[in-house]
Amino acid sequence: HLLSRRQRQMCIRDRVNTLIMIVFSLLCIGAFGFWYHAGYNGIYLIHPRKVFHPLSIVGIILLVPGTQCLSTYLVSFTASLFPQWMKAYEKLMESTGINSGLTVSMFFYSILLAPIGEELLFRGVTMHQAKRVFPFWAANIMQALLFGLFHMNMIQGIYAFFLGMVLGYICEKGGSIYQSILFHMMFNFWGTIISGILPTGNSTLFFVLYFATGVICTFSGLILFRFGTNRLAQKQAAPLYLENTGYDTFYPSN
C-alpha cells in the first residue's frame, strides 16, 4: 500500500512538472515570438522553398547524428572528470520525472514546444540583440553560454553550450530561424526516440566507429548545409526573389 501511494505521488509529480514545462514553453513562444516578429519584421507564413534548399536539409539531417555522437562523447568525458556532476544530473532527472518514461505530453513538449520556444528566445531574440553590439562570433558565444546556463546543471549545460553554438551557426548562416528550429526538433527527436533503439557496445572498435561516425556526419553535414544555403542566397539575390524571402529579413552571412 505504501509503494502504491508513492507511485501515485510520483505520477502526480511527473504530470505537474510536465505541465509546468509546457506552460513555460507556450509563454516563451508567445512572448519571444511576438518580440522577434515585431523587432525583426518576421514573416510567419512563408514558402518552404524560400527558406530551405534540398542540400541544406540533407546537411541538417546529417548534422543530427553527428552532433548527437559528439555530444555523447562530450558528456562521457565530462562525467569521467567530474563524476559528482553526473550524480547531480541523474538526481535532477529523477526528481523531475524525466526518466520515468516518455508520455504523449512529454513527447509533445520535447519535440515541438521546447525547440520552438528555445530557438525564439536564444537564437531569435538573444543572438540578434547581441549582434547589434557584437560581431556574430561573440554574439553566438554569448547566446550559447546563456543556453547552457538555462539548463541549470553542469552536464546538460556543457553539451547545451556546444549545441547552442551549432544552432547559432545554422540560424546565422542559413538566414532563417526556421533552419535552427528544424535541427533542434530533429536533435531532440533523435535523443528522445532513436537513441533508445540503436545498438550499443563497450568494445574499443565500437567507440572508435561511433566517434568516427560523429565526426564524418558533422563535417559532411556542415559542408552540405553551407553549399545549400549559398545556393539559396544566390537565388534570393536575384530581383525576382527580393520580396518576402522568409521568416527572417537578414541574409545568410558568408
Feature locations, PLM:
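Single conserved hydrophobic/aromatic residue that forms the stacking wall/gate
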Residues: 1-12
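Functionally important transmembrane alpha-helices
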Residues: 5-6, 144, 156-214
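Membrane-helix interface linkers and caps
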Residues: 16-62, 77-82, 175-176, 225-242
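Hydrophobic alpha-helical transmembrane segments
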Residues: 19, 57-62, 104-108, 137-142, ...
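Juxtamembrane helix-loop-helix connectors linking adjacent transmembrane helices
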Residues: 43-114, 132
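Membrane-interface helix/loop boundary segments of multi-pass membrane proteins
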Residues: 117-142, 169-176
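Small-polar-interrupted transmembrane alpha-helices in polytopic inner-membrane proteins
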Residues: 136-151, 185
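C-terminal membrane module of polytopic membrane proteins
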Residues: 185-254
